[in-house]
Amino acid sequence: MCGIFCSVVNNVPLNSFNISSALKVILKNRGPDVQDEVVIDYCFGKILFAGFVLWQQGESVQKQPVVEDDFIFLFNGDIYNTSKPEYMSDTTWIAERLAECRCKEQNILKILKRLEGPHCLIIYDKREQILYFSRDALGRNSLLIERICNGFQLLSTSHFEDKKISLELPPLGLFRVKLNDLNSCVLYPWQPLNNYSTQLLRNLDLAIGWKTAVESPMSPDWMLNCNPAFSYNFYEFQYIKNNVNLYKNLIDQSEIKYTLSILHTLLSDSIKNRVRNMAPFCRLCMQKLNISPPCRHAKLCILFSGGLDCTILALLANQFVPVNEPIELINVAFESVKGQNISEKLFDVPDRKTSLVSVNELKQLCPERCWNLLKVNVTRLELQQHLTSRIKHLIYPLDTVLDESLGCAFWFASHCTHSTARVALIGSGADELFGGYTRYRNSYSRCLGNDLERQLAVQNELERDWQRISARNLARDDRIIADTGKTARSPFIEENFVKFIRSLEVYQKCCFGFPEGVGDKLLLRLYGYQIGLRDVVFLKKRAIQFGSRIANKKQNGSHQSDNL
């Protein structure tokens, strides 16, 4: 993961054009291995480019920004569908493609259409004085845009200041700004805009003070419709009352078995790419310049509540990590009561108990692996101190109670002092794809229509959440986890996996005719059962903010936080 920064300002003296010390610290936390800055002139002012790199790919670290004769390039992310050699980083590979096409606009669009993986990028065409910038269509990596005096700036993460206009750049496509006219912008969207994305674009225009013209969609290949046309319906099996018999019966159904085989192939490939594409050193050995690979310390961790999603990720990741390397399972718990005497019992929260059960399952299934369960205990005093001094800046510009709870939980988990990992797998997206949240069950039960109308109510809720997943979760989580020198990777949010799961009917993914812990995320629970998990596949969904005891259920998560 990297920190990237680009500031465009009209009429500014060179000696007053720099990154604030507070912001530089935050960006360097994202990319501690190498940093560089470049300032250039354009027709009406100056542009500052800065890159802060966390080395994860290639034989050696690639300094940013990349400066060529025709362009300047900043990149943050991972690309998984290129044919680049192992010694080359994604940044270098894309820069070479840009150099080959001399940064021509139509060729830039062709390159972007091909990319699969979480990323955001900034390209400056020196000859035409045009700035291009984008986030991937799923919005997995953070890129903020801020209005500043006489210009604007793009940055991976920011520093909270009152009265500053800042928002997450919506992941709608490739934006183009000609620097001789900062009042207008052009968008090449990934796909045709709907009501939600149109509103995001209006919000952007209003905040930054320009008007965006929308061109024809780029339409990446992975976005094309997928219609597997399966006919199975989980609701037809409600007569089976025993949960174990239900799962065995469903797995034996030919169409369901075939669906699970596709799910397995796609999810395994996603995890393999995210586990194998990392630097050969752990966090500690990276600091020792004279050490030779291979380092045998843990390089991979999983943010581990012990729930279904993260346990599946752990079990599959086991296939792709050398057997003599540990895998870290990081579990976070917050002090459940206030008091001066800190004891282990104060951290005996639901997710801690679940993690102990699930790690035992992993040890039974994979006894040759060293599973390091790292327990992170956070007192209320520590929580308040770090929230005020550091975490609130990473959550910014989001500001709700839910943002605070989730942001703090992920920050303390990924900041575990005993962790040597530089890549963190997280289960983001599973609930939105498979129907895991309680509100989906509520949509079904509260609908007074027929079964078709009930299914439509659930589908509408799923679609609404999927459209908002980047703005609600992904970009914030990227900022939070990257602050600890780790790269967050979300195997469930992979282009082809997402395309396949979203092509299934809602009754082929979940069934609210069955009780909690059985029918919600039913397809994923079946998959977990198929690969050998038992106890965890029948656990009820529990949000991390409640399982870790950081949040109070009486609070409304959508309300603005007093601490942000």
From Swiss-Prot:
Domain Asparagine synthetase span(s) in chain numbering: 280-541
Name the domain of life this protein comes from.
Answer: Eukaryota
SUPFAM superfamilies per record: Adenine nucleotide alpha hydrolases-like (SSF52402), N-terminal nucleophile aminohydrolases (Ntn hydrolases) (SSF56235)
Q: Which Pfam families match?
A: Asn_synthase (PF00733), GATase_7 (PF13537)
One GO molecular function term of this record is:
asparagine synthase (glutamine-hydrolyzing) activity
All residue ranges annotated as the Glutamine amidotransferase type-2 domain in the record: 2-180
Keywords in UniProt for this one? Amino-acid biosynthesis, Asparagine biosynthesis, Glutamine amidotransferase
Q: Which residues form the active site?
A: 2 (nucleophile)
InterPro entries to which the protein is assigned, alphabetical: Asn_synthase (IPR001962), Asn_synthetase_domain (IPR051857), GATase_2_dom (IPR017932), Ntn_hydrolases_N (IPR029055), Rossmann-like_a/b/a_fold (IPR014729)
GO terms in the biological process aspect are: asparagine biosynthetic process
Q: Give me the disulphide-bonded residues.
A: none
The record's listing under PANTHER family reads: ASPARAGINE SYNTHETASE DOMAIN-CONTAINING PROTEIN 1
This one is known as Asparagine synthetase domain-containing protein CG17486
Q: Which organism is it from?
A: Drosophila melanogaster
